[in-house]
Amino acid sequence: MATVYDVPGDLLVERVAKALKEVPEIKPPEWAPFVKTGRHKERLPEQEDWWYYRVASVFRKVYIDGPVGIERLRTWYGGRKNRGHAPEHFYKAGGSIIRKALQQLEAAGFVQKVPGEGRIVTPKGQSFLDKIATELKKELEEQIPELKKY
């Protein structure tokens, strides 16, 4: 059985985002169409379903780096801000988006809080991600036969 570590992250996040659309607890907040993802961004996200991709990305990040807290995730999703003539400066991403994503993953039973440490993936969440990774790996093996040896 393949795990999250065995498949490319971008393909996995895309698949997980599609699967999360069918989970009733995961849905974009009312304000999602109107917000930037952080201080460092100039524009809103272009994709209409960007919320599911961010939740899937946060889910994968908690799986790989867990236990992880909101501040560390804010740093991960942050970036450099173009300040005109002034030198560029790093800014963290918005905390509300990450917080709401983690709360929705908790409500779905995929993530749980560990007091003083952050959040970790539950066995249900690990199973959810590993099943998607296994399906994805089988498809990749059909396209690229050399991957079967791994």
UniProtKB/Swiss-Prot annotation:
Q: Which GO terms describe its cellular component?
A: cytosolic small ribosomal subunit
Write the protein's name: Small ribosomal subunit protein eS19
What UniProt keywords are attached to this protein's entry? Ribonucleoprotein, Ribosomal protein
Give GO terms for biological process. Answer: ribosomal small subunit assembly; translation
- PANTHER family in the record: 40S RIBOSOMAL PROTEIN S19
Q: How does it assemble?
A: Part of the 30S ribosomal subunit.
Kindly indicate whether the keyword Ribosomal protein belongs to this entry: yes
Q: Which InterPro entries match?
A: Ribosomal_eS19, Ribosomal_eS19_archaeal, Ribosomal_eS19_CS, WH-like_DNA-bd_sf, WH_DNA-bd_sf
